[in-house]
Curated annotation (Swiss-Prot):
PANTHER family: RECOMBINATION PROTEIN RECR. Residues 81-176 form the Toprim domain. One of its GO terms (biological process) is DNA recombination. Pfam families: RecR_C, RecR_HhH, RecR_ZnF, Toprim_4. InterPro entries: DNA_Rcmb_RecR (IPR000093), Rcmb_RecR (IPR023627), Rcmb_RecR_Znf (IPR015967), TOPRIM_dom (IPR006171), TOPRIM_RecR (IPR034137). This is Recombination protein RecR. One of its GO terms (molecular function) is zinc ion binding. It comes from Shewanella sp. (strain ANA-3). The keyword tRNA processing does not apply. Belongs to the RecR family.
Length: 199
């Protein structure tokens, strides 16, 4: 069945979201049009504002409406000598939810992937290099994902940080809290054994 051009455009636009296929997009569009037009207008307004007003922090590259994000503009955290390097702004939120890290962040917005045309320039590594060269960074914590690309990115950044005599650490990988060994994959178990600590 052919929909009106506007309805078809709405459905196609909703499909840009991750995990939203044609049927899900159609259900969402019908829900907004049939039952909740007020919420649809609010969604449209929020999307429009977010797309035009949210940019990147000039210091750490996470999302913000200001030139500096709340963490970088904080007197206490913005002057911290510890920087945690992550791949995405979602990683910042995950670490912040734990409430244990009190330093600054640097968001790569991806990972090195030469086949996809993602090199050091796309990850903002020149800005990270300026942070390291400033002498204000004592420790760099590498919290990239434990994927091939994440590990390659971590090694590249570690080499860069060594030139500036910065202490480099990597977040631990291993068995999750509450996990059962029989369900953990062999690579994760190997990392757990290699990264064991004395008690």
């Amino acid at each position: 069945m052919k929909f009106s051009p506007l309805l078809d455009e709405l459905i196609q636009s909703l499909r840009c979201l991750p995990g939203v296929g044609p049927k899900s997009a159609q259900r969402m569009a019908f829900q907004l049009l049939e039952r909740d037009r007020k919420a649809g207008l609010k969604l449209a307004s929020a999307l429009s504002s977010a797309m035009s007003d949210i940019g990147h922090c000039q210091s750490c590259r996470t999302y913000t409406e200001e030139s500096l994000c709340p963490i970088c503009s904080s007197h206490k955290r913005g002057s911290s000598s510890t920087i945690c390097v992550v791949e995405t702004p979602a990683d910042v939120l995950a670490i912040e939810a734990g409430g244990h890290f009190t330093g600054r962040y640097f968001v790569l917005l991806g990972h090195l992937s030469p086949l996809d045309g993602v090199g050091p320039e796309e990850l903002g590594l020149a800005l990270l290099e300026r942070h390291l060269a400033s002498g204000d960074v004592a420790e760099l914590i590498l919290a990239t994902n434990p994927t091939v690309e994440g590990e390659a990115t971590a090694h590249f950044i570690a080499d860069m940080a060594r030139r500036h005599k910065v202490v480099i650490s990597r977040i631990a990988h291993g068995v999750p809290v509450g996990g059962e060994l029989e369900y953990v994959d062999s690579t994760t178990l190997a990392l757990s054994f290699n990264g064991r600590i004395p008690l």
